Every structure is written in structure tokens, then in C-alpha cells.
Regions:
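Positively charged n-region of N-terminal signal peptides that target proteins for export
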Residues: 1-5
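Bacterial N-terminal signal peptides
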Residues: 6-16
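Electrostatic cytochrome c docking/interface patches
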Residues: 19-38, 50-56, 111-112
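The canonical Cys-X-X-Cys-His
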Residues: 33, 39-49, 159, 163
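Residues that flank catalytic or metal-binding motifs in active/ligand-binding sites
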Residues: 38, 102, 139
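N-terminal, post-signal-peptide region of Sec/Tat-exported proteins
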Residues: 43-72
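Electron-transfer interface patches adjacent to heme c in soluble/periplasmic c-type cytochromes
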Residues: 62-122, 146-156
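C-terminal capping alpha-helices of c-type cytochrome domains
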Residues: 117-133, 145-174
Length: 180
């Protein structure tokens, strides 16, 4: 057997093992991210609710796609004292002293997903600082970034890895509406 063939055969046999180890690590990280997104209640706000036979239920066809673009909100809700906030029936729009906030599209849609331009590090910084991409506009209530930001780097990386591989949903979420 010539040496070039032996080298190519050895390389071919070793490559799948390396890829398999990387795939296993990535798969474990994505599974951890799915667990954290699910138990961290991300779907409660980022997955619109629809009315079903048993009342409101998550619309998993639009999982983590944020406020539905077809539901137009033009102004903050007028909330009587002593209340300080209101929410839409989909749980994707919140109104309070900060104005109106819309839950973001966390899917990897290349046109409308909010994380489309984020690096892993920017995602971590966003969760730590409460600022878009770690330095932009403030993330508005009710996003619990102060608590999510206490996750470990590994957990935040797992959440990011999971969000990068979920089905993309084209859904243009509106910009926040400032208070009056």
C-alpha cells in the first residue's frame, strides 16, 4: 500500500470521529438550550397565543416569532389607577409607563429575526446589559434580562445555539412605541 493512500484512508477514517464528537457536543448544547428556553418560559411572551377549544394556547406554528405583524398597535394603552400596565391577548404586546413593547422574533429568519445580526458574544452582552446587541437601545419590560443575565456563559451560549437552529418564521415585529 502506498503512503499517500494510507494517509488518505487514515484521514477519512478519523474525520468522522472528530465530526461526530463535534456534532454530539453541538447536539448536547442545543438540547440544553431548548431545555433552558422551555423552562425559562421564553415561549410565554415570544410565542403568540391563539384561542383554542380549551382557551388560550401557544401557537407553536409561530414558536418564538414574537408579536404577530398583522396585529397593529398604534398607541400605549390607557391603564386606570392603580394598574401600571396592560398586555395584548397574544401576550406579545405590553404597555406601561415605558410606552409599548413588542416581543421580538427570536427565530433565525434572515430578514425579520432580531438575532440575525447577533454574534454569540453580542447575545450574551445583550442578556447581561439589557441593551440591544450589548450596546444599543434599551430592552423594554417585561423582558426579564436582569435574571436571564445571571445565567452562566455556557447556558447563554446554549440558548443562543438553540435559537439559531429553530425553524425560521418570517414576522416583522414593530419597533417600540414611546410613552405619550
Amino acid at each position: 500500500m502506498n503512503h499517500a493512500f494510507s494517509f488518505m484512508l487514515a484521514a477519512a477514517l478519523l474525520a468522522p470521529a472528530t465530526t461526530l464528537a463535534q456534532d454530539t457536543t453541538t447536539s448536547a448544547q442545543v438540547k440544553r438550550g431548548e431545555y433552558l428556553v422551555t423552562t425559562g418560559l421564553c415561549h410565554d411572551c415570544h410565542t403568540p397565543l391563539i384561542q383554542g377549544p380549551d382557551g388560550p394556547a401557544p401557537d407553536m406554528k409561530r414558536a418564538l416569532s414574537g408579536h404577530p405583524q398583522e396585529i397593529v398597535v398604534k398607541a400605549p394603552a390607557i391603564v386606570p389607577e392603580p394598574w401600571t400596565g396592560a398586555m395584548s391577548p397574544t401576550l406579545t404586546t405590553w404597555s406601561g409607563p415605558w410606552g409599548v413593547s413588542f416581543t421580538a422574533n427570536l427565530t433565525p429568519d434572515p430578514e425579520t429575526g432580531v438575532l440575525r445580526d447577533f454574534t454569540e458574544q453580542q447575545f450574551i452582552q445583550t442578556m447581561r446589559t439589557g441593551r440591544h446587541q450589548g450596546q444599543g437601545r434599551r430592552i423594554l419590560p417585561p423582558m426579564p434580562w436582569p435574571w436571564i443575565g445571571k445565567m452562566t456563559d455556557d447556558d447563554l451560549k446554549a440558548v443562543f445555539a438553540y435559537l439559531r437552529q429553530i425553524p425560521a418564521v418570517k414576522n416583522k415585529v414593530p419597533d417600540p412605541i414611546p410613552p405619550k
